[in-house]
């Protein structure tokens, strides 16, 4: 399974990413081993996930979510 996730950073911003293991990836973000964007913004909280059968579907959805406004992202959860 391939997943797209949205996490909320400690400063209130949102980060959207792709992974095959959501819990592991959130733990990596919280440990400071995630994306450069989240390293100074821990702890992070998981807000939204979507699952897909293919990596390409998940990556397309990740791109679409990243294009959304903050209000549109909040409407997801």
From Swiss-Prot:
Coiled coil: none annotated. InterPro entries: GIY-YIG_endonuc, GIY-YIG_endonuc_sf, UPF0213_domain. Residues 1-75 form the GIY-YIG domain. Belongs to the UPF0213 family. This is UPF0213 protein VNG_2274C. The lineage of its organism: Archaea, Methanobacteriati, Methanobacteriota, Stenosarchaea group, Halobacteria.
């Amino acid at each position: 399974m391939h997943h797209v996730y949205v996490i909320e950073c400690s400063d209130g911003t949102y980060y959207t990413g792709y992974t095959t293991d959501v819990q592991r990836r959130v733990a990596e973000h919280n440990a400071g081993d995630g994306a450069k964007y989240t390293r100074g913004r821990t702890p992070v909280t998981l807000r939204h996930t979507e699952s897909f059968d293919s990596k390409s579907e998940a990556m397309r959805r990740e791109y679409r979510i990243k294009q959304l406004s903050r209000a549109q992202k909040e409407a997801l959860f």
